[in-house]
């Protein structure tokens, strides 16, 4: 018995593409540690790409699995809001664990927002009914 929704081929390809893109951006970020001339788009983006990647991948993975198992989109929005809250708290309130960095928090929020928009689209068009 299959309880999950059947994703369209393009949906599966797009999810893999998102994770591949995040992986490539992460690799570029870590190469930059050894060679400052290697960066993704700009040096500013390069220094915050890790938070963007983590937020985008985590929200996309959790959201995709929830959609696959027929959960409502509003549950994914709650997950996104929780991720944004955790990100903002971690980047502003816990300076003893992490350097306070509001720009890093903004990149994390942008990652979640992009993921939520993508998940809204695949919720409407990305699965066979």
Question: Where are the regions that the model predicts?
Answer:
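Bulky hydrophobic segments
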Residues: 1-129
